[in-house]
Structure formats: C-alpha cells, structure tokens
C-alpha cells in the first residue's frame, strides 16, 4: 500500500513539473508602430490587451519564439515589455497587475538606471552587443520601440 501511495505522489509530481507553471492561454501581438513605453502601454490597453509580462524563462523563450516568426525580428531588435520601476526606484512591477517582478533576464550590468531615469524594461536581441533576449532598463519616454502586447484569459472572480 505504501509503495502505491509513493508511486501516486511521484506520478503527480512528474505530471505537474512537465506542465511547468500553470499559465493562462496567451496571445502575443506586435503592432506595426513604434512608440515610447507610455504610448505602447496605452496602445495595448486600447486593444483590450496589455504589455507582455514575462514571469519565467519559459515565458521569455515563448516570447522570443513568437518574435522570431514576425517581420520585426532582426539581428538588432528591441521591444518594450510591461514592467517598470516608476513607482519605486529599483522595484520593478508588472504594471498591468501590480505584481513585483520576480523572474528577470537582465543583461550583464543591468539594470543600471543610467542617467538616473531608466525606469522601463525592454527585451532585446542584439548579438553584437551581447543581448540574447535579455533585458535592459531604458528611459520610458526617450525611445520609440516596437512593443509586445498580450491577451490573457481573465482569472478574475465571476459575478453570481
């Protein structure tokens, strides 16, 4: 009996770990315009989407795979994602949910808040500068970049 119980527990652990983190269905979209981070956030919201939240290496890889399928992919591409430390310097949060960023994929020596005003995160693939789908903090209003929107299933409480 004990052996069957242990086998069942191991089976449950294997099934759970093979699915990784339980994440809702997500759809990514990169508009054909470039914008600063604020306008990118507004644009995604106008589509009933949000700037993408990357909560794990699997998420980072999924976003990279998606970008590679689009016309925006080059050997020198950067995209706004949905986190900033605008509210509290050094504490990055996913702006759509207010959740603190716990997974990161910073490029070496980032975030550096260069010039004292780098508060928004970009995802970059620039091999010549050692960016391999890594993150950089940048000025929110200073650069117009492509950006990645996502739609997610609502995990909110349904009314009675």
Curated annotation (Swiss-Prot):
Disruption phenotype: (Microbial infection) RNAi-mediated knockdown results in reduced West Nile virus infection levels. (Microbial infection) RNAi-mediated knockdown does not affect infection levels with dengue virus. Disulfide bonds join 44-140, 120-140. One of its GO terms (cellular component) is extracellular region. Residues 1-20 form the signal peptide. It comes from the Eukaryota. One of its GO terms (molecular function) is carbohydrate binding. Gene3D superfamilies: Mannose-Binding Protein A, subunit A (3.10.100.10). InterPro entries: C-type_lectin-like, C-type_lectin-like/link_sf, C-type_lectin/snaclec_domain, CTDL_fold. Female salivary gland (at protein level). SUPFAM superfamilies: C-type lectin-like. It is found in: Secreted. Keywords: Disulfide bond, Glycoprotein, Host-virus interaction, Lectin, Secreted, Signal. Glycans are attached at residue 76. Its main location: secreted. Induction: (Microbial infection) Up-regulated in salivary gland following infection with West Nile virus (at protein level). Up-regulated in hemolymph and midgut following infection with West Nile virus. It holds the Pfam family Lectin_C. Residues 23-140 form the C-type lectin domain. Putative lectin. (Microbial infection) Facilitates West Nile virus infection in mosquitoes probably via capturing viral particles and presenting them to a ligand on the cell surface, thereby facilitating viral entry. Interacts with putative receptor-type tyrosine-protein phosphatase mosPTP-1; the interaction probably mediates the recruitment of West Nile virus particles in complex with C-type lectin mosGCTL-1 to the cell surface. Antisera against the protein added to infectious blood meal blocks the interaction between mosGCTL-1 and envelope protein E of West Nile virus and reduces West Nile virus infection after feeding. This is C-type lectin mosGCTL-1. The lineage of its organism: Eukaryota, Metazoa, Ecdysozoa, Arthropoda, Hexapoda.
């Amino acid at each position: 009996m004990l052996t069957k119980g242990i086998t069942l527990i191991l089976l449950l652990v294997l099934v759970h770990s093979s699915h990784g983190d339980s994440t809702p269905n997500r759809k990514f979209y990169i508009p054909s315009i470039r914008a600063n981070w604020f306008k990118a956030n507004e644009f995604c919201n106008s589509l009933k989407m949000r700037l993408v939240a990357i909560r794990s290496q699997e998420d980072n890889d999924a976003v990279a795979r998606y970008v590679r399928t689009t016309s925006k992919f080059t050997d020198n591409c950067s995209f706004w994602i949905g986190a900033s430390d605008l509210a509290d310097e050094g504490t990055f949060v996913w702006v759509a949910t207010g959740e603190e960023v716990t997974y990161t994929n910073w490029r070496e020596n980032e975030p550096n808040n260069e010039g004292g005003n780098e508060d928004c995160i970009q995802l970059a693939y620039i091999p010549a500068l050692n960016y391999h789908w890594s993150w950089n903090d940048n000025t929110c209003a200073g650069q117009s970049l492509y950006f990645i929107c996502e739609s997610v299933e609502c995990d909110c409480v349904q009314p009675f």
